[in-house]
């Protein structure tokens, strides 16, 4: 289970001032002139993905001024800079840092002409969220999609590295496999007997971190929205019971399922994770930032691609309203090496900085060091 005290303190530090199993690295190999995709080197083949199966993809085009982005972020986040705090809205970000408008329109048109349905066109104007049948995806990216199994878990993957059509030149694409899976650090032990030992409640944490003086000054999260990038939705009645038990204000719980059109559920895809991590996060974020609004954005499953769409929704759609973001899901960094999602996520999190969002990754667990090797 996550060490909630450290997590709560990390989130609080940003909220009160506001107004992702290890695996060794494998390189692509070439076979018959084509480079095999990394997940195609794992496990054994089960067969072919059904031609009619829905495949969701996330496309990231190069921005016109990508080379300037890091410098801009440094300027708006450094207290000594005259640009400090002059953050962008998602629309302003897209207007300046987005892809060339003609290239962006051509990419959208090319996808539509080849059977893709456009689900979202985020305001950053570099990204495209779409889906198509497996046979259309195979034809467009010139690679078969296979079903494979590795260590008992079934997954799908593109056999070869995708061939990106000219209209998408320079783009990276996630969703062609679901091999990499995120996980929480939650551990369940419902029959634990505390005995003579002590446990921590919200007021204990507030006392330990000397938060009470801040509360008295009105620094309690009021007017701030915390977003949670998660899988398996927390239930409002559970949060209400936690708040009632500890005499906390009834902080709102807002819920959104991603991608567009998916259904909100307490299950995390086909896994057994459930919603325990989401419940823990909603309980303790609102136990510390007691007047904040908590907005959970719930992935359809635990794959890295599922979380791409969640991150995008928070950065783009919620860019106007969300001040702080927490996520307790991740995986060993080596699992992500060479994946399109790594590039996509890095770009999205840099955009988040440009918008003034503060992100915390499993701050009470291993943070960003999920390999736990430093």
Language model regions located:
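Bacterial N-terminal signal peptides that target proteins for export
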Residues: 1-8
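C-terminal segment of classical bacterial N-terminal signal peptides
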Residues: 13-21
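Substrate-binding/charge-relay-adjacent region of secreted/lumenal peptidase catalytic domains
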Residues: 24-124, 129-374
